[in-house]
Amino acid sequence: MRIILITGISGSGKSVALNVLEDAGYYCVDNLPAQFIPELTRYLDAQGYTHLGVATDIRSRESLDQLPDTVRALAAEHQVEVIFLTASTDALVQRYSETRRRHPLSARTDGAAGGGAFNDTALMEAIEMERSLLSPLAEAAHRIDTSNVRTNTLRSWIKELIRDDSQRLTLLFESFGFKHGVPSDADMVFDVRSLPNPYYDLALRPLTGRDTPVIDFLQGQPMVLAMAEDIRAYVEKWLPSFIADNRSYLTVAIGCTGGQHRSVYIAERLANYFRAHGNVLVRHRELAPAG
């Protein structure tokens, strides 16, 4: 059975991710404590189900400590992947402000009977408390930062991640702009800001690293080709180590100043090379479609 566990910070898009799994034919359960996941898996396996999606988060905080052991036990018999959704505190505060929903940790105090007593924990404090409590889970999961991501874009990303379950590891190349921040979900980060910048050519400025004139410009620069080759060699050298570690995903982030030209070109070039090695995805954060 393929089991995908969705966890992460409240307000970061877990419901969206679980809905994508459900639309893809997964048997989905929201807010299931970790200790019940093995029992549910055994039952569904006996019934002939092949795909299970489970969301578990701070609402089941008493059992979260059991999740790593649960994942290891399930992985002995099933294909298990953990996706951890996160977002910046500013983005989360904005979302809570728009929806007017209460954060789980601001709604009650630990150990309160009858559903808990309301307290005065500020929203930002609740978010940071949750981030601290969940940090051990994030370390062992595939992280997705949804801070600047629209709902439709997140849906597309999740669809891509679950599209092909025949590969042991999905390799994701992500371009980004340093002026918008480094992706928190990256496993490797490469800085290509020292390369010649098409931005300073007025004819190339409105284009992207996927457009032929920009590609021709960058491919004509020996420095660009040399750096792309060095990054390729590094990733290829260490990729077997990540596969041996039973990783489901590896995110390689390529950053330039604005995330429009150089990083996009390098990410596309690397993806084209590594597609021969298995399941490869490309994400251009700053070129994400509207909607």
UniProtKB/Swiss-Prot annotation:
Q: Name the domain of life.
A: Bacteria
List residues binding GTP.
D57, I58, R59, S60
Q: What keywords appear on the UniProt entry?
A: ATP-binding, GTP-binding, Nucleotide-binding
Q: At which positions is ATP bound?
A: G8, I9, S10, G11, S12, G13, K14, S15
Determine if ATP-binding is one of this entry's keywords.
yes
GO MF, one annotated term: ATP binding
Q: Give the PANTHER family listed for this entry.
A: RNASE ADAPTER PROTEIN RAPZ (PTHR30448:SF0)
Q: Which family does it belong to?
A: Belongs to the RapZ-like family.
Biological role stated in the UniProt entry: Displays ATPase and GTPase activities.
Name of this chain's protein: Nucleotide-binding protein RALTA_A0325
Naturally occurring in which organism (per UniProt): Cupriavidus taiwanensis (strain DSM 17343 / BCRC 17206 / CCUG 44338 / CIP 107171 / LMG 19424 / R1)
